């Protein structure tokens, strides 16, 4: 009996985590919109193989009109709205956006809850087209709307 109790004690957190993971993936799959807040970021500039990274201010935006069948969505912020291409997998949504100047924006929203915030874990990368090359990586959460 004691052995069985120990086995259940060890397995129970795994069962809870699996159930939580399934719920997070369902939340992601059913989201028609996501409000994303990226509080932590780092920006990197480099020239001639010399890299300089520094912290960067965070930001937020909303991904609306998510259509997994067509594979697209719309990014909406205070600066306006833009078209996004989307790759929809059961456990993640990748949103890709391009600016007129050639910058690439990639946002990945995971079917995994942030334990302290309750939202879905997310990252946002910006790859600037200008020279010298500049990139930034943002970390945060997205809440389904």
Predicted regions and their residues:
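N-terminal signal peptide c-region/cleavage motif recognized by signal peptidases
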Residues: 13-18
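Contiguous, well-ordered beta-strand patches that form the walls/edges
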Residues: 68-107
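Sec-dependent signal peptide recognition
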Residues: 2-8
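Short, solvent-exposed loop/hinge segments that bridge or flank secondary-structure elements
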Residues: 25, 30-72, 106-112
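Edge beta-strand at a domain terminus
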Residues: 55, 127-145
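Short, surface-exposed coil-to-beta transition loops
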Residues: 58, 104-110, 121-123, 134-138
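Short, intrinsically disordered, charge-biased short linear motifs at domain edges
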Residues: 19-26, 125-132
């Amino acid at each position: 009996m004691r052995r069985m109790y120990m086995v259940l004690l060890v397995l129970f957190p795994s069962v809870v985590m699996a159930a939580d993971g399934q719920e997070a993936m369902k939340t992601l799959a059913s989201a028609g919109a996501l409000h994303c807040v990226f509080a932590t970021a780092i920006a990197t500039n480099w020239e001639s193989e010399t890299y300089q990274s520094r912290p960067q201010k965070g930001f937020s935006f909303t991904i609306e009109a998510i259509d997994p069948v067509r594979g697209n969505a719309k990014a909406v912020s205070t600066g306006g709205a833009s078209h996004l291409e989307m790759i929809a997998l059961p456990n993640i949504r990748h949103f890709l956006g391009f600016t007129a100047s050639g910058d690439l924006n990639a946002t990945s929203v995971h079917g995994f809850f942030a334990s302290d915030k309750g939202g879905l874990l997310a990252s946002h990368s910006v790859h600037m087209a200008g020279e010298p090359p500049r990139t930034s990586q943002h970390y945060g959460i997205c809440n389904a709307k």
